[in-house]
């Protein structure tokens, strides 16, 4: 079990070591920009108040943190947690003007924060990549304040057979796009495989 965890940690880290320079561009290209609408819709639905703080885990380049911050004119206290140092530095540079956003290099399974610290916990397209989802969820609810909200945005299996068939065809193209843009198809082979192997919506909800 320990060897499996170490292997996945190493694999995921190597994936982001390869893609961090083109991460935002590839997200826009692969989703035709739709991922930005999904993120905005989630934050809009949360309706954060200016006195509420946020922990954004597996933050990537900080899209969710930025949208959250702009909802209240950058008055919220926000901490972005990112396990990959290159992704963290990219996100930190991108959001350098947001003085209310702090960055921390840490894993979702071992958060360096006290119990009952945050009003919101967000994780966008990151929970597939954690090495121990049970520990990740345990840590999430540990650091949330009583009544705090856990918000997860993630890819999952498509129940509609026609749409699922179209996605399966498109998923074959994703690694080819990655090879052309990033120079390496392996990270996008991992992306496609991780979505296919991940829990469906009901299974993930049951874990919580």
Where do the language-model regions lie?
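A short SAM/SAH-binding and catalytic strip from SAM-dependent methyltransferases
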Residues: 119-133
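N-terminal, positively charged/glycine-rich alpha-helical extensions of SAM-dependent methyltransferases
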Residues: 1-24
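A short glycine-rich, Lys/Arg-flanked "PGG" loop and its adjoining helix->strand segment in the class I
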Residues: 134-149
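Conserved alpha-helix/loop element of class I SAM-dependent methyltransferases that forms part
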Residues: 32-50, 67
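C-terminal alpha-helical "lid/dimerization" subdomain adjacent to the S-adenosyl-L-methionine
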Residues: 10-11, 81, 153-207
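A generic alpha-to-beta junction signature in SAM-dependent methyltransferases
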Residues: 46-48, 72, 95, 144
């Amino acid at each position: 079990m320990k060897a499996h965890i170490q292997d996945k940690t190493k694999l995921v880290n190597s994936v982001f070591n390869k893609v961090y320079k083109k991460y935002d561009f590839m997200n826009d290209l692969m989703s035709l920009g739709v991922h930005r609408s999904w993120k905005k819709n989630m934050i809009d639905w949360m309706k954060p108040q200016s006195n509420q703080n946020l922990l954004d885990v597996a933050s990537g380049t900080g899209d969710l943190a930025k949208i959250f911050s702009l909802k209240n004119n950058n008055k919220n206290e926000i901490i972005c947690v990112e396990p990959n140092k290159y992704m963290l530095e990219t996100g930190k540079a991108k959001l350098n003007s947001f003085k209310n956003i702090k960055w921390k290099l840490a894993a979702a399974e071992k958060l360096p924060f006290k119990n009952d610290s945050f009003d919101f916990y967000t994780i966008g397209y990151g929970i597939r990549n954690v090495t121990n989802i049970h520990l990740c969820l345990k840590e999430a609810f540990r650091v949330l304040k009583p009544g705090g909200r856990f918000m997860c945005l993630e890819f999952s299996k498509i129940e509609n057979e026609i749409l699922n068939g179209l996605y399966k065809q498109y998923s074959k193209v994703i690694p080819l796009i990655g090879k052309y843009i990033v120079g390496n198809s392996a990270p996008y082979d991992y992306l496609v495989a991780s979505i296919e192997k991940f829990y469906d919506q009901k299974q993930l909800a049951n874990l919580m």
